[in-house]
């Protein structure tokens, strides 16, 4: 029993320590709020917004947003941190976009998303600003549209963005008479920017057409989503022409021929068109609705096209091309590494050398009959920081003392290169926890071993 209590106490203590360690190592993603944003909003052609009716914004016209954001050096931005910008209620995103925010060094700085439901654009950062924390800056460019549910038009619309007041005159929705033969429009999906919705109305005046043949061909970089196709002859109502695409979508069908069309494919096997012939005479308006999928990325503001053509025994060939604007956005970021102060080390080295040399010249004595050369040389050398050389001969001596002091001074300059230092972001938590766990197991093993003995 006593052993079990000891074991329970040990496990409890270790659990508390491990829990405290885990809590201290978890890093929480933060919302970045300390920044400066210099922003501007213009019309799609770059001209400034104005409450002058002659410079009005069209009902469906997109507005261009430019945001230039800077962060103080002391603000730490970690991987997973986010920054959110919200549109005023008078504006809205037309579709959900996800786009990259690229750093000037070629690395990904963050992912940005626009949400048409909340009117927010959110950037989720990578660790680039941990590696390069100084002079942090970012730009975000995107389009938005007037939120027709929250404004009264025609007239002046006022709103605030980034603490700046804007005022713009907005036109009413254009009322354009539908072509008596064919009308076609397209628009980008609100949730998926890779999808384009197309709507077609043919023969809205309900005239009698013999053997009506329709042929629809989508533009480049698109394929038809077959399951989305709705193609129908609308119910004929005498004296009640189909005045709009909305009315066409709501009028009862006389015949649904969606499953009877013949599809065309391109060389890649993608469905890019369809055709159908209504035999005999028909005075029904025709409504067609379907979705295309983009097969490649589109540049900002580029329009994709879609063309439908009709022919019949008693009508001239006619075609109509519809366009859908592709919304897009982009971002850029820049920063630099935090450099350490440059260190200069000066090292002065002094070397003193003193040498003393004594030289004795040899003398040769000569008699009249005998030449006798006698030379005695004695050399003594001692090294004690001074060097002395002495030469002695049997003749006259000349002592020449010489002392030389040599001083050498050298300067060494050392420049330390800037080091890239990554702050702890909690990524080491797994490794450290594993190590702590092994230590705990080892301690527990020793404890049980000694207890049993």
Swiss-Prot record:
Keyword Amino-acid biosynthesis applies: no
PROSITE patterns per UniProt: GRAM_POS_ANCHORING
Signal peptide limits: 1-29
Gene3D superfamilies noted in UniProt: 2.60.40.1280, 2.60.40.740
GO MF annotation list: collagen binding
Membrane topology value: Peptidoglycan-anchor
Disulphide-bonded residues: none
Residues modified as Pentaglycyl murein peptidoglycan amidated threonine: 425
Protein's GO biological process: cell adhesion
Record's compositionally biased regions (Low complexity): 342-403
Entry keywords, A to Z: Cell wall, Peptidoglycan-anchor, Secreted, Signal
Residue ranges annotated as motif LPXTG sorting signal: 422-426
Compartment annotation: Secreted, Cell wall
SUPFAM superfamilies: Bacterial adhesins
Residue numbers spanned by region Disordered: 331-403
GO cellular component: extracellular region
Alphabetized InterPro entries for the sequence: Adhesion_dom_sf (IPR008966), Collagen-bd_dom (IPR008456), Fibrogen-bd_dom1 (IPR011252), LPXTG_anchor (IPR019931), SDR_Ig (IPR041171)
Propeptide residue intervals: 426-453
Domain of life: Bacteria
UniProt xrefs under NCBIfam families: LPXTG_anchor
Annotated protein name in UniProt: Wall-associated protein
Species assigned in the record: Streptococcus mutans serotype c (strain ATCC 700610 / UA159)
Origin organism lineage: Bacteria, Bacillati, Bacillota, Bacilli, Lactobacillales
């Amino acid at each position: 029993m006593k052993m079990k209590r000891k074991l329970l106490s040990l496990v409890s203590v270790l659990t508390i320590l491990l829990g405290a360690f885990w809590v201290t190592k978890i890093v929480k993603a933060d919302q970045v709020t300390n920044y400066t944003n210099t922003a501007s909003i213009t019309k799609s052609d770059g001209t400034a917004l104005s409450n002058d009716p002659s410079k009005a914004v069209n009902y469906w016209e997109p507005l261009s947003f430019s945001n230039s954001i800077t962060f103080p050096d002391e603000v730490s931005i970690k991987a997973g941190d986010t920054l959110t910008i919200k549109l005023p209620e008078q504006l809205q995103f037309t579709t959900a976009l996800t786009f990259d925010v690229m750093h000037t060094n070629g690395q990904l700085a963050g992912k940005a998303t626009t949400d048409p439901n909340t009117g927010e654009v959110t950037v989720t950062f990578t660790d680039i600003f941990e590696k390069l924390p100084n002079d942090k800056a970012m730009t975000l460019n995107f389009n938005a549209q007037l939120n027709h549910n929250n404004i009264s038009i025609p007239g002046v619309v006022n709103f605030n963005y980034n603490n700046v007041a804007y005022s713009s005159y907005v036109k009413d929705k254009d009322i354009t008479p539908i072509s008596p033969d064919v009308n076609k429009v397209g628009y980008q999906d609100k949730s998926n920017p890779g999808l384009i919705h197309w709507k077609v109305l043919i023969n809205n005046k309900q005239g009698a057409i013999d053997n009506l043949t329709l042929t629809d061909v989508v533009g480049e970089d698109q394929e038809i989503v077959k399951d989305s196709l709705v193609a129908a002859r609308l119910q004929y109502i005498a004296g009640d022409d189909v005045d709009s695409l909305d009315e066409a979508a709501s009028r009862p069908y006389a015949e649904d021929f969606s499953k009877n069309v013949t599809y065309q494919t391109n060389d890649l096997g993608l469905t890019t068109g369809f055709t159908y012939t209504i035999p005999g005479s028909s005075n029904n308006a025709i409504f067609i609705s379907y979705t295309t999928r983009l097969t490649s990325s589109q540049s900002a503001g580029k329009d994709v096209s879609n063309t439908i053509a009709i022919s019949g025994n008693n009508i001239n060939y006619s075609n109509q091309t519809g366009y859908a604007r592709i919304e897009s956005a982009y971002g850029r970021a820049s920063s630099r590494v935090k450099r350490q102060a440059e260190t200069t080390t000066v090292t002065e080295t002094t070397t003193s050398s003193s040498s003393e040399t004594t030289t004795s010249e040899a003398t040769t004595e000569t008699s009249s009959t005998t030449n006798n050369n006698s030379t005695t040389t004695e050399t003594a050398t001692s090294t004690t920081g001074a060097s002395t050389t002495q030469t002695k001969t049997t003749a006259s001596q000349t002592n020449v003392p010489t002392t030389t002091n040599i001083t050498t001074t050298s300067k060494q300059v050392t420049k330390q290169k800037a080091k890239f230092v990554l702050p702890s972001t909690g990524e080491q938590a797994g490794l450290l926890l594993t190590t702590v766990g092994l230590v705990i197991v080892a301690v527990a093993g020793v404890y049980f071993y000694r207890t049993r003995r």
